[in-house]
Design a protein with these regions (language model features):
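Catalytic cores of extracellular degradative/oxidative enzymes
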Residues: 239-445
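Residues at structural and domain junctions
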Residues: 20, 49, 120, 363, ...
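Beta-rich interaction/scaffold domains
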Residues: 1-83
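Zn2+-dependent metallopeptidase catalytic core
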Residues: 127, 139, 148-164, 171-259, ...
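Beta-strand-enriched, solvent-exposed domains that form extended recognition/catalytic surfaces
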Residues: 19-22, 51, 58-222
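Generic structural signal marking isolated hydrophobic packing positions
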Residues: 7, 63, 134, 194, ...
Length: 445
């Protein structure tokens, strides 16, 4: 039995050595046991020695007498639920990507002014006040992911809130992000995301996260089973019609180059009522953004890091009005009136928003050190227009009129935007690799 302590001070401050408080702790074997009931941090399977009602009941008796019962009882309750019935947690369990910080890569390595998102869709919507249980399995000592709660149709600069996760159980109450001052009045709540800005070299094995809480909404990842998705969309639309005051109107899809967050009502109208193929729909803007990457000389090739666009994506989402559309540092905001149009695949629908969509994408892709606001970003719009057969919006006749006089000394800054665009685009006409070579040089330098 311990009766005496001896403290030896090896270094003091100002030749004085002092101590304030010493706390003595007894090893808590019960807490250690309760913290290690499960095979891993997702808490979906009990270890063999605890996989029985007898074992858990015996532990529960001890926990009920423990001074820290309120901290230990949650694990006992989870264990009892697992013993009661076998559950399938696959739809709520996510193995996280380990792409590193692609937003930082887009900015620092590729020179883009705004492009890049690291949000990973869960297909779960959370509403303010709901309590989420988030279970995390990861290697000991590894950096851990975050969970991100969002507000559907939120405001620029105020639409999401991030929480750092720890290994094991995390209990988080969904925050309220909604603001009554907004012009559009969506239902409070929005999609829940996971964000893991680390690589295998930093983390070892990929973290696995399981989420309890919220409800599932229609999510389509390129290549998913289309029939299965449509059934989920129909069921969610029925719920939305039955209880619109308590159901967030949201639909989301993911492709190689971007994540889109819109409305379930628009998705139902286009995919169910109009019969548009969902895979063709999600590829419409993915293809055009990929074309913009290629115009800029980007390619998925890790062996060429200054031009490597592997895993670089953006987020395009329904947001509060801020002009017709806008490009922010972490998303492109669009408004309600084009929700159906974005999902349609006919050329008239595509052309009706083609310039504006690629104009905003161009803002994000534009290399900051050579960006000429509202001019160079339109290289991507014009490229899309030409590729889609919608014409070339460079004003060549105006350029010719300016060049015709012997004294042609109009300052570039005094020219209108179509002429300024033409000064760049004519070089692309001269050599179709001009823009790719120019951007590649900027990235290299």
């Amino acid at each position: 039995e311990l009766k005496r302590f001896k403290f030896v001070y090896k270094k003091g401050n100002l030749n004085q050595a002092a101590s304030s408080v010493f706390c003595l702790y007894k090893h808590d074997e019960l807490k250690n046991t309760v913290d290690n009931l499960f095979t891993d941090g997702t808490m979906v399977k009990l270890k063999d020695e605890y996989n029985s009602e007898e074992a858990i009941n015996a532990l529960e008796e001890k926990v009920n007498k423990h001074p820290l019962k309120h901290q230990l009882v949650s694990n006992i309750e989870i264990a009892k639920e697992l013993l009661k019935e076998e559950k399938d947690f696959s739809d709520r369990t996510f193995t996280l990507t380990q792409y590193g910080n692609t937003h930082e890569k887009a900015r620092n390595q590729l020179g883009m002014s705004r492009y890049g998102t690291d949000l990973q869709s869960t297909g779960i919507v959370g509403r303010p006040g709901q309590v989420f249980k988030v279970f995390v399995e990861a290697e000991d000592g590894a950096p851990l992911p975050q969970i991100v709660f969002s507000q559907q149709e939120g405001r620029f600069g105020h639409w999401k809130q991030e929480y750092q996760l720890k290994k094991g159980l995390n209990v988080i109450t969904v925050p309220e992000i909604y603001n009554d001052s907004w012009s559009q009045k969506p239902i409070k709540g929005g999609p829940v995301y996971l964000m893991n800005r680390y690589t295998p070299q930093q983390q070892g094995k990929a973290p696995v996260v399981r989420i309890e809480g919220g409800e599932e909404f229609p999510l389509y990842n390129s290549g998913d089973d289309k029939a299965e998705f449509l059934e989920k969309l129909k069921a969610y639309k029925a719920k939305l019609d039955k209880d619109p005051a308590n159901t967030v109107d949201v639909y989301e899809f993911n492709t190689t180059r971007f994540m889109y967050t819109g409305t379930a009502k628009a998705a139902y109208q286009v995919y169910v009522n109009e019969g548009v193929d969902v895979e063709e729909s999600v590829q419409v803007w993915n293809t055009r953004i990929q074309d913009a990457f290629e115009l800029s000389g980007l390619k998925d090739d890790p062996s060429d890091p200054t031009n490597d666009s592997t895993n670089v994506r953006t987020s395009i989402r329904l947001m509060q009005p801020y002009g017709a559309a806008y490009a922010a540092s972490d998303h492109i905001g669009v408004q309600r009136h084009i929700q159906e149009i974005i999902l349609r695949t006919d050329q008239d629908s595509i052309n009706s928003i083609l310039w504006g969509m690629m104009h905003e994408v161009g803002h994000q892709l534009d290399i900051a050190t050579r960006e000429w606001g509202e001019i160079t970003n339109n290289m991507y719009s014009n490229n899309a227009y030409v590729n889609d057969g919608a014409g070339d919006r460079a004003a060549y006749s105006k350029i010719h009129n300016l060049l015709a006089p012997d004294d042609s000394s109009v300052n570039f800054n005094n020219l209108d935007g179509t002429i300024q665009l033409g000064m760049f685009w004519q070089l692309q006409l001269k050599k179709d690799t001009y823009w790719a070579e120019l951007d590649s040089l900027y990235r290299k330098k």
